[in-house]
Amino acid sequence: MRFIDQLDIAGKKLLMRVDFNVPLDGETITDDNRIKAAVPTFKYALEKGASVIVMAHLGKPKGKRVDSLSLAPAAKRLGEYLGMEVPLAPDCIGSEVEKMAAELKPGQVMMLENLRFHAEEQAKTPEERGDFGKQLAALADIYVNDAFGVAHRANASVVDVPYAAKECCAGFLLKLEWEYLGEALKNARKPYIAVSGGAKVSSKLGILNNLIGKVDDFIIGGAMANTFLLAQGKAVGKSLVEESLVDTAKEIMDKAASSGTTLHLPTDFIWGKDIETAQGVCDGDSVPEDGMLLDIGPESAKKFCEVIERSKTIVWNGPMGLFEKEPFAQGSLKVCEVMANLDDATTIVGGGDTDAVVHQAKLEDKFTFISTGGGSFLEFLEGKELPAFKALKENS
């Protein structure tokens, strides 16, 4: 796989796939971190004398034009970061777009309209996607993928364009993800630990199976811990649990025991009868029948933090409790704070909820790396080859 700084891009037109799927309130962007993250690649391209045609998606328009999902706000915000006007094309393919692209001069940037206004972008088969990727590729000399957030999706702009493009490469954001996540999986400094939380074991099975045996310790919190507690024969009251995965949880615990990975589960909890009010702390042997386990308790937080403090590499995905509700946020925030204050450790965070915890704690600058991917981050940690990387490797 080649990267943008390995190609001669002077005077070339770049077709750059980015992840600008940002939250909007009307036409106002409420969080522009995804746009900000791509700026270094844009600045490098412009400094080297290239022009850039930007392509991205926003929301789920389901193959139809939806005016409220136009990329106009993203084009405006990108222009503000680059100090120039970034005109928005009326579509992403077609004669008018081709004319705009042909007239683009070195040092200029234009943005294509939402790729998902065309059903072909997300169609399942190459036959259904048709020539959509070829039409996009024809707009430029070089394809640049800088969108880790969609690297796990076999969309036309991710997997078809590289095969149709004259040249292709990864941008700096994709390069960062590749290097940090690759290092975490292959050359991690030890002790190496994984911290996983969130609601469901089912969404983390791949990570559990791939990392157990590779990490020294695996901390499990959040509602997904309930399924493991049930597998140990413990009561969990009315807590969220995946009863169909109890046997799977037992298998995972057995695998950890035989492979040298120490599994850490919570032993006390903040519980409630509803998700608004905390009733207090209970330990794992005295969970109220009408109670829900909604956060790890102080003893569990202390135990988890001791494991974190002695680690050199940490990969974190998923909160320790229902952090969106203030009474049940303390476990996640405590774990976050301890990670953020480590001086000599590589700390890697991924996933929307985990990212939200870090921003809620205002500690985003204290982590080694915060991944821009949700599903991509999970699949990378599952050991899967992401479609975006496969396409770039095969066409570099």
Curated annotation (Swiss-Prot):
Mind naming one GO cellular-component term on file for this protein?
Answer: cytosol
Annotated Pfam families: PGK
Instruction: State if Kinase is listed as a keyword.
Output: yes
Q: In which pathway does it act?
A: Carbohydrate degradation; glycolysis; pyruvate from D-glyceraldehyde 3-phosphate: step 2/5
Q: Which UniProt keywords apply?
A: ATP-binding, Cytoplasm, Glycolysis, Kinase, Nucleotide-binding, Transferase
Query: InterPro entries of this UniProt entry?
Result: Phosphoglycerate_kinase, Phosphoglycerate_kinase_N, Phosphoglycerate_kinase_sf
- Kindly state which reaction or reactions the protein catalyses: (2R)-3-phosphoglycerate + ATP = (2R)-3-phospho-glyceroyl phosphate + ADP
Binding positions for ATP per the UniProt entry? K204, E324, G351, G352, D353, T354
Its EC top class is transferase
Give EC number(s), comma-separated. Answer: 2.7.2.3
Please name the GO terms that the record assigns under molecular function: ADP binding; ATP binding; phosphoglycerate kinase activity
One GO BP annotation is: gluconeogenesis
Q: Where in the cell is it found?
A: Cytoplasm
Broad class of the protein's primary localization: cytoplasm
Q: Which family does it belong to?
A: Belongs to the phosphoglycerate kinase family.
Subunit field text: Monomer.
What is this protein's record name? Phosphoglycerate kinase
